[in-house]
Amino acid sequence: MSTAIAQQKIRIRLKAFDRRMLDLSCDKIIETADNTAATAIGPIPLPTKRKIYCVLCSPHVDKDSREHFETRTHRRIIDIYNPSAKTIDALMKLDLPSGVDIEVKL
């Protein structure tokens, strides 16, 4: 039998419409994890979701005249292995932009 050491892991999922803001947030999280002696893996890019909206230009007839609008949701995953209490405190105090949605799983 092999004895496997159970590692603690924090998985952080980030979502944003702006890719640059998302990458800056990922860099801050990884830098914080590295400063507290935790191992950070990532950011792992996930597929970008595109949502396309079709709007009629004319209020009455002319169905051939349409405009298309889209929103793109960029996503990333960061895994932090062997976090200490100092790592968790530093991540809680981290100031990230409001345009980035963050989901943390322990």
Swiss-Prot record:
Pfam families: Ribosomal_S10. GO terms for molecular function: structural constituent of ribosome; tRNA binding. The keyword Ribosomal protein applies. InterPro entries: Ribosomal_uS10 (IPR001848), Ribosomal_uS10_dom (IPR027486), Ribosomal_uS10_dom_sf (IPR036838). Signal peptide: none annotated. GO terms for biological process: translation. The keyword Ribosomal protein applies. GO terms for cellular component: ribonucleoprotein complex; ribosome. Keywords: Ribonucleoprotein, Ribosomal protein. It comes from the Bacteria. Involved in the binding of tRNA to the ribosomes. Belongs to the universal ribosomal protein uS10 family. Part of the 30S ribosomal subunit. This is Small ribosomal subunit protein uS10. It comes from Prochlorococcus marinus (strain MIT 9313).
